[in-house]
Amino acid sequence: LSYAAQIATHRGLRNLASLSGTLLSVKSSPELCLALMILEANAICYPDNVYEFPIQPIDLNPDSIITEIRIPIQSVNTSLERVSRTPLDKSIVCSAVALIIQEDNITDIRIAISGISEQPIAIQTIDSSIVNLSISKMKSMIYEAIKDSADHKYSDYLGSAEYRIEIATILTVRAIKKSLSKQ
């Protein structure tokens, strides 16, 4: 979460901005949202309800305000990998991974990716046993899961849909490896 906050914007703007404003801005960097998605955080809004990430500003009451972000206590190893034109540019593709650990065993894996569709998405079809596979099998399974979840029409001058899916796969494998090394 701290790394995501550091790369979301430069120090001057971080000192002025609020987390809720950053999360609701369409043009903001996706790293914070991805970090909160893999940590299964909720946004508490007054006077509305509890929202999961990513928050869709269109769903919010215009009179509501995010009053708190709740992150459940959990034992996780997290990692965030990204590709951008420069270190402070908005990510072209970004992948966040959380390995949930109970009694020294990986019990679940959470993956969230931005840059393969209009909004950041959580990849639901990956099983925690993937960490025990060879790298080539892991990459193949992740590629298929991302391909199934991606918006195949989502492309722009920064990358085609195919490029974004391939990069998301590479970044996700890197993030899993980095999370495993923290164990």
Regions found by a protein language model. Give the residues of each.
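C-terminal structural segment of proteins
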Residues: L1-Q183
